[in-house]
């Protein structure tokens, strides 16, 4: 039976503060810090899904050279998610190279899909920013459609 996911709300601070994501991909390792103070709901959601193994084995289903790579859809088509949606959080940063943000289908439709910016881009503030790549931008640049996230874990942020 397929696992049922439900939105966790904001997790306790000790589960989301000073955390980073370590993602093993077909092309190598990507590490990104999480902005728990700016986007606690979104960080809680990403931590919850990651700890549950949601992202393990999923692919990057969308790559726009010079713009973004996108993943987090269990269907691999850009239409799937965890089975729930949650509200946007105010965007407090520009969409610069390495920024990690939620992909959505309109206001308050966040789920599991996320994207990583390949270059600084002036986007409207419609996509909740919740992290930034700290290691592996060379790997991000090599990601192509179909590349796999083989392992995604949450860990204490490197000092």
Please state what every model-predicted region is.
Residues 1-159:
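Cyclophilin-like peptidyl-prolyl cis-trans isomerases
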């Amino acid at each position: 039976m397929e696992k049922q996911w439900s939105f966790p709300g904001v997790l306790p601070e000790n589960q989301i503060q000073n955390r980073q994501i370590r993602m093993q991909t077909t092309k190598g390792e990507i590490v990104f810090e999480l902005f728990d103070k700016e986007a606690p709901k979104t960080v809680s959601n990403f931590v919850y899904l990651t700890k549950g193994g949601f992202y393990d084995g999923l692919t990057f289903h969308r790559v726009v050279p010079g713009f973004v790579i996108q993943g987090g859809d269990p269907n691999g088509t850009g239409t799937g998610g965890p089975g729930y949606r949650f509200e946007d959080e105010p965007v407090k940063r520009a969409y610069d190279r390495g920024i990690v943000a939620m992909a959505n289908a309109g206001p308050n439709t966040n789920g599991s899909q996320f994207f990583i910016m390949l270059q600084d881009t002036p986007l409207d503030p419609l996509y909740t920013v919740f992290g930034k790549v700290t290691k592996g931008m060379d790997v991000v640049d090599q990601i192509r459609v179909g590349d796999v996230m083989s392992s995604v874990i949450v860990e204490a942020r490197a000092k």
